[in-house]
Amino acid sequence: MKSKVPMKNIRNFSIIAHIDHGKSTLADCLIAECNAISNREMTSQVMDTMDIEKERGITIKAQSVRLNYTLKGEDYVLNLIDTPGHVDFSYEVSRSLCSCEGALLVVDATQGVEAQTIANVYIALDNNLEILPVINKIDLPNANVLEVKQDIEDTIGIDCSNANEVSAKARLGIKDLLEKIITTIPAPSGDFNAPLKALIYDSWFDNYLGALALVRIMDGSINTEQEILVMGTGKKHGVLGLYYPNPLKKIPTKSLECGEIGIVSLGLKSVTDIAVGDTLTDAKNPTPKPIEGFMPAKPFVFAGLYPIETDRFEDLREALLKLQLNDCALNFEPESSVALGFGFRVGFLGLLHMEVIKERLEREFGLNLIATAPTVVYEVHLTDNSIKYVQNPSELPPENHIACIKEPFVRATIITPSEFLGNLMQLLNNKRGIQEKMEYLNQSRVMLTYSLPSNEIVMDFYDKLKSCTKGYASFDYEPIENREAHLVKLDVRVAGDVVDALSIIIDKNKAYEKGRALVETMKELIPRQLFEVAIQASVGNKIIARETIKSVGKNVTAKCYGGDITRKRKLLEKQKEGKKRMKAIGKVELPQEAFLAILKID
């Protein structure tokens, strides 16, 4: 079978950039220049298909598009794979880069290299990708192209003397960039005559076609009459359809060949049947070994999600299952809370992932949700020499059964203007950080490497980092190991009852300070009741902080005009008895703000 476009004329490349460096806008420019979408259909951020992506100006789901371009009379196929830039979605980046031969490293001419860019460049270098530096936003008055080129050379060690200078917004330098992609990025390699070997680097659910796999054909070819073996599951399926990717519509094709990127429909009901990183091969003539080196995405942060309307528990399950069809990193299991009823313990890649999922559940499925404080997974060594992994504070065994607790640590890389160095180091010390390295990239920018406990960064670290550096610092992290720590469970009691959804695992030295701040905040948030309410913070059985909400008093003596004082006293005693009884059996409704307050407290 003859290839439609010779393999030497195919270029597979992705775009690496930090949030807000103009990656999606540059992708739009390349699409427009290659006429992949008509002017009428062209919208800004055409590669970002979710509303939430456009509103937040971020890319979450990696998209792909096939572009046709003619250079010097020869036809080329350019497969552009758009990748997310946020630290939470780095698993999307790693799988996308596995299917490319080259990457455009897009850096904002006004901001220079950021921490997330460095992390993604290292993934690209590990995959032996050809990296093309691209300086974007050169038309801005405060652009400093020479300094940024020097910055890239000093930080990453890539020669930038011939770096492309573009402005995606003003469409400057786009033709030159396309020519550079064709002349510099190598063509894919692979054996056209070998058995089919295709890497699944993304999958999603389509309402009409079921689960779809976005694949890169490494060896061989695939056609619509073939039977396919999914190597991870060992199951065989017929091919229902093959398509080329395009943001607005899928373009049908009869076959996909070595070096190409395309969409495969096998008529499956769930993306779990075609896991990302799995290998597709020919059922009759399978490839001997699957493609190596893929790790399934592991949740980093866990939180409880509970519907405010308790009868919508099943709706929440359905909604999570639907989101899971598109998001293999999302996992969940049912749990119950005395305070909140039935809900789910959900695993996320990070805080942005958690926010996005919660917002999508509320927006797309009309659910009202309460999210509990995010936690990480703790390794608890018990006195009987067994090990228990705890992701929910309520599962922590009693203190006398625990030999030691180990918590996960991450290695954080932070790039900051040097004027904010003092503030930043103070923040990192408050978060129990241990400095590993400090490096001046130039006179005005510093790169810090710290090891930090994971539970210190899942709360509010990102917001604090941005506020203490006026938004200029950038941050990236990678998990390293579990280390022993002095941790305790901090409980909040309202009217004598432990509110399990407000429990947190915290460093022993911070427990008093956090407990005091918590009860003071709760006092402001819980409405006054007809009886007195005690709010207490406790570690084990020891109360470490307390606040009292005074009761609302009804004037029961208002109807007594003059007369005997004993009549008034009798009414007041009766009221006192009633309040006592209320206090014994009364339940306090906690507002949603009380659960959110725990996230905001230092």
UniProtKB/Swiss-Prot annotation:
Record GO cellular component, one term: plasma membrane
Signal peptide per UniProt: none
EC category: hydrolase
Catalysed transformations (reactions): GTP + H2O = GDP + phosphate + H(+)
Membrane topology note: Peripheral membrane protein
Location of this chain's protein in the cell: Cell inner membrane
Keywords: Cell inner membrane, Cell membrane, GTP-binding, Hydrolase, Membrane, Nucleotide-binding, Protein biosynthesis
A GO molecular-function descriptor: GTPase activity
One of the protein's GO biological processes: positive regulation of translation
Family annotation (Pfam families): EFG_C, GTP_EFTU, GTP_EFTU_D2, LepA_C
Keyword Protein biosynthesis: yes
This protein's name: Elongation factor 4
